[in-house]
Design a protein with these regions (language model features):
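Basic, polyanion-binding surface patches
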Residues: 1-220
């Protein structure tokens, strides 16, 4: 039987991303999040407006979207309740957040140079996407939530993939049987189980989905 419900959060289960950006002093900030939508070589991020990630992104227009697997769950969890914003915003204080500048050290992850953007990649993450800001749009424009939550459209310019998760014989295809993303569902971490059912859409060659946006593009 269905009942009417009002859950405070609607995290039905999406992959976790670690967003690396550059602080004003050139050090790196690293923030976990899971409000992501990928369409072609574009990524839509939903971020809290008072976060250090948003501050850095607005200033530099660059980030790396690092995709951890289940193997990095402990590192991701070590970043929980940390913020690079000082002083800590009141809403985050109420939730037990504290200021931490050395995010890579706290997570025990390794920064490595990117090839196009300035923020570093996370060595341990099997997938790393160098991206640049295209557009920003506030949620609830003109309403009480304006400024609190904002969506950012990111254009992916370069993708780095650990070769162990590539499909055999295909340099440009990720094998879903090898890639095990970390999933965040209602504030808890999960991994993927085995394939639930054969997909008829999976019979379509991935190359047929290619769009002009997927051509690797160097910054102007």
């Amino acid at each position: 039987m269905h009942v009417t419900s009002k859950p405070p959060i609607l995290y039905f289960g999406t992959p976790v991303a670690l967003l690396s950006t550059l602080n004003e002093d050139g050090t790196a900030n690293l923030a976990p999040m899971s409000s992501t939508i990928f369409a072609s070589w574009r990524c839509i991020l939903g971020l809290q407006g008072n976060s250090k990630t948003v501050e850095n992104l607005r200033r530099t227009g660059e980030m790396v979207i690092n995709m951890p697997s289940v193997d990095q769950v402990s590192a991701v969890d070590r970043l929980a309740k940390t913020t690079g914003t000082f002083p800590v915003p009141e809403d985050k204080v109420a939730r037990g957040f504290y200021y931490e500048k050395n995010k890579f050290g706290t997570a025990r992850l390794t920064p490595v140079p990117s090839e196009i953007v300035a923020p570093p990649r996370v060595l341990e993450c099997p997938i790393q996407l160098e991206a640049m800001l295209v557009a920003e749009r506030p949620l609830d424009e003109g309403g009480p939530l304006e400024g609190f939550l904002t969506t950012f459209e990111m254009r992916v310019h370069r993708i780095h993939v650990e070769d162990s998760i590539l499909m055999d014989g295909h340099a440009d295809r990720i094998d879903p049987n090898k890639w095990r993303p970390l999933i965040f569902s209602f504030q808890q971490f999960y991994g993927l189980g085995s394939q639930a059912h054969h997909s008829r859409l999976g019979e379509i060659p991935e190359a047929l989905y290619k769009t002009p946006d997927m051509v690797e593009m160097e910054p102007a």
